[in-house]
């Protein structure tokens, strides 16, 4: 019997393979933070895992990719929610931009990354247009690295 760190069993697995297969009563084996095997329920009998997750009635699918985010804006949620886009930009975003420093950008990005991960997103493409002082984008990319999300900076 092979050893593994984690086994997820009894799941509906959305494979996203070429044929868009869905595996009922599926099993995913993870070892050293890498998926090492995916298959039907019979796969579970081939492995002994330190941690077993019974995902009966649950769906497992690959991480989502967000192709458009502004992580620094995480701190602006709720401001101007009753406004149309350009009114919101003028009254909320543009008036707040000059207050953003490195620390605020870092914690806004960190919070945004945590929210993304919590909702199943594993990769973010972030557009940082708040450049009120040099190096603010470095704080955003550092937050991505610290939280462990895959990040692309645009």
Cite the ranges covered by each PLM segment.
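Histidine-rich, glycine-flanked metal-binding segment
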Residues: 1-6, 13-61
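Flexible loop residues that form catalytic
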Residues: 16, 70, 129
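Short capping/connector residues at structural and topological boundaries
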Residues: 19, 27-28, 65-66, 94, ...
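Alpha-helix boundary/interfacial micro-motifs
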Residues: 21, 27-28, 34, 42-43, ...
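Short C-terminal domain-edge/linker segments immediately following a structured domain
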Residues: 37-44, 67-69, 83-84, 94-97, ...
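Hydrophobic faces of well-ordered beta-strands that scaffold small-molecule active sites
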Residues: 63-67, 124-126, 151-154
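Alpha-helical scaffold segments that flank or form the walls of functional sites
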Residues: 77-127, 131-149
